[in-house]
Amino acid sequence: MTETVLNQGYGYGIVIGLGFAFAIVMILVTYVLKRYVGEVQDSEHFTTASRSVKTGLISSAVVSSWTWPGTLLTSAGMAYEYGVCGSMWYSFAFTVQITFFTVIALQVKRVAPGAHTIVEIVKARFGQASHAVFLFYALGTNIIVSAMLLLGGSQAISAITGMHVVAAGFLLPLGVWLYTVSGGLKSTFLSDWTHTVIVYIVILITLFVAYTSSVHIGSIDKMYDLLTEVSKTNPSTGYKGSYLTVTNRDAVFVGWNIVIGGFATVFCDPSYGQKAIAAKPISAMKGYFAGGLAWLIVPWAMGSAAALSCLALTNNPVSVTYPDPVSSKQVSEGMPLLYGMTALMGKNGAAAGVLILFMASTSATSAELVAFSSVMTYDVYRNYFRPNASGKELVRVTHVFVTIFAVCMGALAVLFNYIGITISWIITFIGIALGPAVFGITLTLFWKKMNKYGMIIGCPMGSITGVVCWVGSCYKFSNGVVNKTTLNTPYANAVGNFTGLFSGLIYIVLISYFFPNKSDDLNNLNEKFVLGDDATAEEIVDAETEKKQLDRSLRIGIFVSWIIFFILVIIVPLPMYGSKYIFSKLFFRGWIIVIIIWTLIAALYITFYPLYESRDTIVYLCKLAIGKAKAPEPMNYVDAVEVEIESLSDDDKEKKANDFL
């Protein structure tokens, strides 16, 4: 067994010390925004950030939400196992779901701008029974993804520092809980930005050390030579055993499994819906597309730096596992990420690796906490128990659910660890068992002829079909052996993912045609959503969307999403796969240079654009600090009504005033 690179002090220091430090900073920021900028922590602000988040923060939130520990660990494992195409396939495949979800985000802003959760929309259209079905899928995804975030982070931190995995599992969400309870979704956006900036800094350091300053590698050409040499002693499954080719059948299967199976982890996870709801209408499309393209480079660059370094230095005494290669179990756990950073930078590299895993775990966990509490508050508590609950009561309830979930997700992560469930296994399971709800929510938002039975019957039938085909194909491809290991083989996963996702679509369409009902007017959905009675003027006014802008943005979003899909999963990888091309040294130089430039652009955008968009607030706070400005008083509900009335034409003032009052 490989000894831990760092001692337990690093693990506890980062998890507890840094966790509480971030919590204190976020709580302080929340106080400043409340005290000096006039942000009120009402029920609408806690769950939707007053639907006022701008493009830059939406982009950083997308990057943060999709940068799981599994993102960094699994992409590194794929890069170590398959070479240059491993992290490429991972990043390309998972980017597709983000760009397609842009379309969902835009449609939510068009037809249901007053919604608090994406699950609420199903109830507004189809009623209680359909709502209960999709609630099961949304909470199932939310709970499993949350546990997976902590599982990946706690296992990796334990492996590199020796910190007990149970302690890591329960302590990781503690600091997150503190600032999430204090600041709600807005604090999540702010922590997303902070965490993401740090992740980009670590990635850039790793890239430049690997390809410019490392005494063991130090140049692109040296990396090429080392990868060529290691393929002779430890060949890959790719063409001629090379790690410098995209021609690898196993990698293609894994990539397409991610493309299909990954949709459920985005479309069914209410945390992504929360970000769509929180965005300003005109910010949704730009924020999601820019965030998706900025995220794409995170696993690609990290795999190309840390994991390829780990692979290239296999026969060098500096390797953590020298003289042996990294074991298949360690590869499946994503350890090439940490081992590669350790080989490049020693204990400093290992500490940096633990740091970004901590950032990935806690930032995404915060979003999941808010999503769970929002769904439980609005879709369960207010829907089934207290329809007339006040805004203050809803805030108290969200705090309770955030607290409960913070404890439960840690317990589930520990359970997964002890029964031997891996991150890749969980991702596969979500795609197969919960994937049918992808078309359930998509058609709910877009197809007027879909009826409630499509959701009630079609989605569960799709899940059953996917699981049955998954187990059956596992039995066939694994010579009759069905267990948690054989269920995670690429061919069985492919069958389960495809049948689970697309059988759900078929069932929903057939059921909707066999049991037709009156086509719904999707434009009337927003009338069924009720804002909290403590909503401020801005929240009330912003609930009325700019429909013409959104119509145009939706058309652009659909077109761009399909273009990105074809480029990333067909036009770029498949011709390279079919050509059986092994990278030349010149081509590899260009490949790495593109990665470095892309990373720099993404890092600069995510770091500075949110600051640029918030420049007025920053200047205002600076003036407050030197006594040249006065903090406004937050508006109450009566003030909100007056502001709204004044914004209307004279003919509509009396009617609207009566509606509000």
Curated annotation (Swiss-Prot):
Task: State one Pfam family annotation.
Answer: SSF
Q: Which GO terms describe its biological process?
A: putrescine transport; spermidine transport; urea transport
Q: Which GO terms describe its molecular function?
A: putrescine transmembrane transporter activity; spermidine transmembrane transporter activity; urea transmembrane transporter activity
* Residues spanning the membrane: 13-33, 56-76, 86-106, 132-152, 165-185, 197-217, 251-271, 288-308, 352-372, 397-417, 419-439, 454-474, 495-515, 556-576, 591-611
Q: Gene of origin?
A: dur3-3
The lineage is:
Eukaryota, Fungi, Dikarya, Ascomycota, Taphrinomycotina
The alphabetized UniProt keywords are: Golgi apparatus, Membrane, Transmembrane, Transmembrane helix, Transport
Q: What is this protein called?
A: Probable urea active transporter 3
Q: Does the keyword Transmembrane apply?
A: yes
